[in-house]
Amino acid sequence: MTEQPEYAPTPDTDEARRALAVVTRVVTDAGLEHEAGARDGELVVTLPGEKKLKTVVSLVVRERALSVSAFVIRNADENHEQFYRHLLRRNLRMPLLAYSIDASGDVYVGGRIPLRAVTEEVVDQVLGVVLEAADGPFNELLLLGFRSSMQKEWDWRVSRGESLRNLEAFRSVLERTDGATPE
């Protein structure tokens, strides 16, 4: 019998214990930061990103399925139709998981994988899909849903000589070339 990690409560079935051991082995072998979650059979894994600093993923081994959930971005301030259309189109190309929203309109990526399908390869693929879903479109989502706020922040920082480091990826879009001064 596979010994359970001491930081994750033991699920109730042999199949669930096997799946939890597989998930734990994959995240440990990959050197990913992880810890036990608040629920039985839950591991909370931090995936480092390039556009989004990090993505925190909840992996919960339940009686029949591995539940996967990760926050992507908060509810857009503007251009809701374009913002959500972009996500829905990405859903068509995304294997295993899908985007969804909560009652506040915040965007998550998630899904459920049957326990019998939980292998090292599948867990690795799921983590890759989560990372691509959260990190890949992050800058486009910011521009679609938060452009006005970003422009105000840029203009404010420029007018005061503040650092633009956190907005540097958007310089080509936000920098005013028309000679206009911030309001």
What function would you assign to each model-found segment?
Residues 41-77:
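Hydrophobic-cavity lipid-handling domains and compact docking modules
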Residues 1-54:
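Charge-rich, low-complexity N-terminal segments
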Residues 117-157:
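A contiguous, mid-protein "functional segment" used to position or interact
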Residues 142-183:
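Short, highly charged C-terminal tails/helix-capping segments
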Residues 44, 99-112, 151-156:
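A short beta-strand-loop-alpha-helix capping motif that often carries His-Thr
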Residues 72-76, 113-122:
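A generic structural motif
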Residues 33-35, 56-58, 98-100:
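Short, surface-exposed charged micro-motifs
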Residues 69-110:
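Short, internal acidic amphipathic alpha-helical interface segments
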